[in-house]
C-alpha cells in the first residue's frame, strides 16, 4: 500500500511538471486562475513594482487576488496570516524549529491551521510546481537554481513572483520606507489596505515622535550583530535596522559583512543589539557576551547588550514597529 501511494504521488508530480513545462502550460494555468476567481473585486487589476531574481526592477500585474500562494520565511508568512490569507497558502517554507514558528502557531491558530503545507526551510522547484501556485512571495536568494529557479521561469508560466527588496541586499541601502512599501504592496495585492494603512500610519507616527524627542541628543555608536560560533555577522547601515538606528540618533561604525572578536572589542560601541533566531541562539549569544574577553567593552560594563529576535531587524514587515521600539528602548532606556 505504501509503495502504491508513493507511485501515485510520483505519477501526479510528473503530470504537473508536464503541465508546467509544456508549451501550453501557461494557458492552462491562466484557465485555472480564471476558474477560481469568478466575480473578482473591482479593486483589480493591481500593478506592483518588484524585482526579478537578478535584482533588476520589474513590473507585475494582478488581475485578481492570488488564490494559491507559496511563501518563504516567517515575517512574509505572518504578513499573509494577518491579512487573512491562510486558506490561500498552499506552501510555506520556514525554520519549523525556531521560536518564531511556535509563536505564529500560538498567535494565529485558526489562520495558521488553514495553511496547506508547512515545509522545513526550503522548497525546491519540483516541489513548488507540484503545489500549483499562482503567486510566489520570497527572498531573492530563494529564486536560485537549486530552489525555485529564476523568476522569469515562473513568469513565463503565468505565475507572479515578488522578491522582498529588503532581504539579500537587493537594495544597497534599505530603509524603513522600503519596508513600508512591502507592507503597502501586500495590502494592495490582497485588497487589505485598511489593515496595512493603519500599520503604516503607526510606523510613521512613531518615527516622527521619536525623531523629535531624540533631536539634539549626543549620537551613539551602535552595533547590530548575530553570533553563531564562527564569524560575527554585522548588520551595517545598508539594512533596515541600520536606518532605524540612524533615525533614532545612532550610527553603525562598521561596514563589513562579518567582523572578528578583535574588531568588535576595538570598535567598543555604546550599545550592542544581538539578534537571534531561536532560544538556542539567544542562549548562545548571552553566553558569548559573558566571555571575559569582552569585559573591557562599554556596552558590557554598562549593561547595554540587548538580545532581540532577528525578525525585528531583518525584513521585519509587520514587526517593523516592534523593531523600532526595541531599538529605542536599548538606546534610550530611561525614556
Model regions and ranges:
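Alpha-helical, coiled-coil/dimerization segments enriched in small aliphatic residues
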Residues: 233-260
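Structured C-terminal subdomain patch of bacterial secreted/periplasmic proteins
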Residues: 27, 173-188, 193, 197, ...
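Structural recognition of the beta-strand scaffold that forms the well-ordered cores
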Residues: 70-72, 90-93, 135-139, 161-165, ...
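Bacterial Sec-exported substrate-binding components of ABC uptake systems
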Residues: 2-79, 188-224, 268, 276, ...
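Extracytoplasmic/secreted envelope proteins and their assembly/folding machinery
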Residues: 63-66, 73-78, 125, 129, ...
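Extracytoplasmic ligand-binding site segments that recognize negatively charged/polar headgroups
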Residues: 98-100, 140-151, 159-185, 218-240
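Short, solvent-exposed loop/turn elements at domain surfaces
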Residues: 56-60, 77-82, 98-103, 230-236, ...
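A short, structured surface patch at a secondary-structure boundary
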Residues: 70-131, 135, 139-141, 253
Amino acid at each position: 500500500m505504501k509503495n502504491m501511494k508513493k507511485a501515485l504521488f510520483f505519477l501526479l508530480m510528473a503530470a504537473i511538471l508536464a503541465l508546467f513545462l509544456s508549451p501550453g502550460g501557461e494557458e492552462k494555468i491562466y484557465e485555472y486562475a480564471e476558474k477560481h476567481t469568478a466575480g473578482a473585486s473591482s479593486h483589480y487589476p493591481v500593478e506592483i513594482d518588484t524585482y526579478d531574481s537578478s535584482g533588476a526592477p520589474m513590473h507585475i500585474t494582478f488581475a485578481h487576488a492570488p488564490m494559491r500562494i507559496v511563501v518563504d520565511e516567517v515575517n512574509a508568512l505572518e504578513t499573509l496570516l494577518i491579512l487573512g490569507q491562510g486558506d490561500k497558502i498552499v506552501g510555506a517554507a520556514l525554520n519549523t524549529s525556531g521560536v518564531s514558528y511556535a509563536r505564529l502557531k500560538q498567535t494565529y491558530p485558526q489562520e495558521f491551521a488553514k495553511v496547506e503545507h508547512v515545509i522545513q526551510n526550503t522548497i525546491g522547484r519540483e516541489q513548488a510546481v507540484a503545489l500549483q501556485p499562482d503567486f510566489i512571495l520570497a527572498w531573492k536568494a530563494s529564486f536560485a537554481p537549486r530552489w525555485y529557479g529564476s523568476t522569469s521561469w515562473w513568469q513565463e508560466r503565468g505565475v507572479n513572483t515578488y522578491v522582498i527588496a529588503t532581504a539579500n541586499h537587493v537594495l544597497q541601502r534599505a530603509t524603513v520606507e522600503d519596508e513600508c512599501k512591502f507592507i503597502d504592496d501586500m495590502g494592495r495585492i490582497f485588497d487589505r489596505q485598511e489593515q496595512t494603512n493603519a500599520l503604516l500610519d503607526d510606523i510613521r507616527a512613531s518615527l516622527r515622535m521619536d525623531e523629535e524627542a531624540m533631536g539634539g541628543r549626543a549620537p551613539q555608536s551602535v552595533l547590530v550583530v548575530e553570533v553563531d560560533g564562527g564569524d560575527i555577522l554585522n548588520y551595517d547601515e545598508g539594512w533596515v535596522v541600520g536606518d532605524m538606528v540612524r533615525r533614532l540618533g545612532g550610527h553603525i561604525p562598521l561596514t563589513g559583512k562579518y567582523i572578528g572578536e578583535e574588531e568588535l572589542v576595538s570598535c567598543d560601541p555604546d550599545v550592542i543589539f544581538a539578534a537571534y533566531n531561536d532560544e538556542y541562539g539567544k542562549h548562545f549569544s548571552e553566553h558569548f557576551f559573558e566571555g571575559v574577553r569582552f569585559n573591557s567593552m562599554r556596552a558590557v560594563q554598562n549593561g547595554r547588550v540587548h538580545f532581540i529576535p532577528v525578525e525585528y531587524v531583518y525584513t521585519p514587515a509587520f514587526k517593523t514597529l516592534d523593531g523600532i521600539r526595541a531599538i529605542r528602548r536599548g538606546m534610550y532606556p530611561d525614556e
